[in-house]
Amino acid sequence: EFLVDKLIPQGTLCALVGESDTGKSSLLRQLALSLVYGDNDFLGFKLKESCRNVIYVSTEDGEMATSVWLNKYFGEEIAKDDRLSKLKYVYNTEGIIKNLREVVSTNCVDLIIIDSYADLFTGSMNNSNEVRSFLNMYNNIANEFGVTVVFLHHTKKASAGMVPNKNSILGSQGFEAKMRSVLMLTQDDSDESLRHLCIVKNNYLPESEKSMSYVLRFNQYLAFDITSDRVKLN
């Protein structure tokens, strides 16, 4: 079963990776809003009907930066407070596992977004055992409560401009191995407003679904629109 059709399987660990400045945080914030607003789809991908509560753990942006983004996103539109109350932002990450466990054990939560993995993981990123034991804490929460956890993470600088693939992820292969789905967001070579959303790993999709990117346009609201284009990854 998918929380977001084709992209994010329910009750699993997943990742959105890419170079800096591609709009990864914006994409995940937009997904969070789509869920809590009760939308039927996110960028054309069907959303599962469920309780629509989201926790967003933000290590890079504080309250000020988050509210700037929200104001930009909504523009002239008045945000619906009753819907927004279903999205909880967490800025203090001390004791985060214990706190997340407490919240999801007493509330129905669909999605936990970790933005970003590199800030929360304090071990050696190239040590598979350390990476695995860190991710297992989140995996246990996902398995126990059926909540989906999406990590925002970066790709290696050396992989810039290369064909999107899961070997470009920064750090140990242990990270990718724990993920059921890995999405990669890349910049278009010729149009700076375009991004390519690529499925570089998904245990539940045929290879044919992973061979082409979905072309997105980054708009003036710091959010994405889906275009009708798909482009071969190679």
Report the location of each language-model feature:
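Hydrophobic positions on the alpha1 helix immediately C-terminal to the Walker A/P-loop
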Residues: L27, L31
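Pre-Walker A adenine-sensing motif
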Residues: E1-I8, D41-G44
